[in-house]
Amino acid sequence: LAGVLICTGNPVISQGKVQAQLQVVRSKTMTVTLEASGGRMVKKASVAGTVTLPSDRNGSDYTFLGWSTKRGQTRNPQYQAYETIKVTRNMHLYPVRYRWSQEPDINVKNLAANLDQYSRIIFVGDSRTVMMGQTLIGQYQNSVSDKVSFICKGRQGLAWMKETAEESLTKALKAAEAEEGATAVVFNLGVNDLIHRRGTEFDYQKKASEYITYMKNLAKQLSGFNCKLFYMSVNPVNTAMKHTRKESEVRGFNEALQKGLGDRYTWIDTYSYLMKFGYTTHNEFRGGLDDGLHYSMKTYKRIYSLVMKNLKKS
């Protein structure tokens, strides 16, 4: 009888082990199916039950924004590229594609002129700022350039800011002292310092720390001028179109800067605005090229408009 009791006890323990093993197997086999531009893609969840979502290419008439459980969504994706999500069940995700034909062509001619609290607005940035300036001056001439100026150069970042742009900005602020009212300075740098080779590790936190340290010191140096400082987020990129930058690192860089700059700078979150409402990557300055980095003139005007609204609220 004792032997029988021993025999009936062991299978129960074994059954519990089998059930536990089955649960582990089930968690490993959770999948996310993505309807990508190149065809259906299936990604298995890791042992931790997570999946990192890929990027996807832009089309000839749309910008890829991210992923959603809803088919046909055109803006404000549920998930963004290179976002790591927890998978508790099998999922089916569809690309969120912003159709270029739906982008409004807004008139921003008088936005700066109507901004009474600032006598001058200075944008400091890289090629994205260059193209925004070219768009505004090309379409509105003196109505923009009389009050708005640009200190910018393509393919530049923090080193250029230290070596060249800082001196140019200081001179511009000294010249503006003769004018009534404060000067608004809007910085938009960082995307070129997030470049790295595909597949290599990149410490964006370290790069963000370098920016934060420098920008805080710069704010102290500029405290003697009648100016207010703003920092515009690094705006969206598409890794599938240009592999030298990753979406998740742009987001992480922005989060670090927004937190680290503190109250010395007013943060302008154009990144979230563009992801929510969409943007166009058909770049007229490069023959309509879509390089996953630069935008259309319509998008540059919308970015400028959002900046002006933030300046007005400050």
What does each model-found stretch correspond to?
Residues 205-216, 247-253:
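Charged helix-capping and loop-helix junction motifs
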Residues 3, 16-101:
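Secondary-structure capping and domain/repeat boundary segments
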Residues 237-314:
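Catalytic His-Asp segment of secreted/periplasmic serine-dependent ester chemistry enzymes
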Residues 121, 185, 229-231, 267:
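Hydrophobic/aromatic residues located in beta-strands of well-ordered beta-sheets
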